[in-house]
Amino acid sequence: MEIVSKLTLKTIGAQPKPHSVKENTALASIYGRVRGKKVGQSTFGDFIKFEGEFEGVNIATGEVFRSGALILPKVLESLLAGAVDGENTVDFAVEIWAKPSEKGNTGYEYGVKPLIEPAASDELAALRNQVKAALPAPAAAGEAAAEAKPAAKAKAKAEA
């Protein structure tokens, strides 16, 4: 696994060269947890940089990359940006494809296949479940009352 400053198709070596895509081609699997987003600008226009924990797998090579920042193709950027509102974290997992296209100057366009539905994340859910599993099960109301009566009688006898 390689840690990169930002996760993009280019940084993981999965961005096709212009006019090189002749058939639908799987490029990368990207998944993670989005905690926030910032708008940035480049020579190609505005983009959204997502913040959180992300991993990307170059499907052609199998290499795995990890980063705290993520920049996505527009087709996915708009879908994910709508799910992130700054108050919640969002878990997602997608596969990104390139398919031949006459539009634009690259000769291809991106497609996205969701591997899971983007969903708000309950970050404490796993910890909560571990704590519940570690605690003894609560006694039934009748059992607790039955155990309390003999203990109270024994205490009263000891004090007398």
Swiss-Prot record:
One of its GO terms (molecular function) is DNA binding. Keywords: DNA-binding, Early protein, Nucleotide-binding. The keyword DNA-binding applies. The keyword Nucleotide-binding applies. Binds to single-stranded DNA (ssDNA). Has a regulatory effect on phage DNA metabolism and transcription of early genes. This is Single-stranded DNA-binding protein.
